[in-house]
From Swiss-Prot:
Belongs to the NAD(P)-dependent epimerase/dehydratase family. Disulfide bonds: none annotated. Keywords: Carbohydrate metabolism, Galactose metabolism, Isomerase, NAD. Substrate binds at residues 115, 140, 169, 183-184, 198-200, 207, 263-266. Pfam families: Epimerase. The active site is at residue 140. It comes from Methanocaldococcus jannaschii (strain ATCC 43067 / DSM 2661 / JAL-1 / JCM 10045 / NBRC 100440). It catalyses: UDP-alpha-D-glucose = UDP-alpha-D-galactose. This is Putative UDP-glucose 4-epimerase. The keyword Isomerase applies. Its EC number is 5.1.3.2. One of its GO terms (biological process) is galactose metabolic process.
Amino acid sequence: MILVTGGAGFIGSHIVDKLIENNYDVIILDNLTTGNKNNINPKAEFVNADIRDKDLDEKINFKDVEVVIHQAAQINVRNSVENPVYDGDINVLGTINILEMMRKYDIDKIVFASSGGAVYGEPNYLPVDENHPINPLSPYGLSKYVGEEYIKLYNRLYGIEYAILRYSNVYGERQDPKGEAGVISIFIDKMLKNQSPIIFGDGNQTRDFVYVGDVAKANLMALNWKNEIVNIGTGKETSVNELFDIIKHEIGFRGEAIYDKPREGEVYRIYLDIKKAESLGWKPEIDLKEGIKRVVNWMKNNNRT
């Protein structure tokens, strides 16, 4: 049995689907703060609870759990700056609570979602590999890194094995264009409504956009990775201006973007070195144009606009 925290969320629900496709039994733990009931796979068991609940073991039978895939988190960078206590409560104390349940019930493996976009900070060199210095620019980046360190500590103290996946910018179906969504779903949402999206700064800032299906596949493979920290991205950088052009072309949008002042605390250029993931047998399969086409179709068909 695999426990997926945040399994009703954007990335977590794709992981659940991939596990069930591969005949795993799955329990979803999600408090539906940002998760969505519509994302829940009917073949999974669903528990509506919070990773911070001290009585989690009264709600979930941890004796049946062999692996935890820990996706539940506070993921809003700007929220973390405005409310670092809330961010730390979920991302640090919530993670410790999950680790304590694992220790108590002898669960020997965790796969953890970390952030390649947030833990490294402003890159010293590109592409950014796993040995790049850690220098977060936000409480979110720091809380993700502290989560990593607690997991490594529990490995040293109690022998709990881990795979830590540092995601780049994940996009795909089920990403909510409201709130702290990725730029791709926000741009698509705007252009499908025939509205001009806002680009903060000059639009030359770059990101590494990885498709959610590829990320789900990485989590499945990570069940067999032992005590590894691995970047999960594409190894390619795409500017926000290039992204706008790709989406504009896919949708047939006739307007232009609106440029606004840059946001504080955001990295200017980043993309990840994925050689380690490739050496472990994982590589991204869906390129950006194909991925965007899928998201546009999904948003049209699901009335998310």
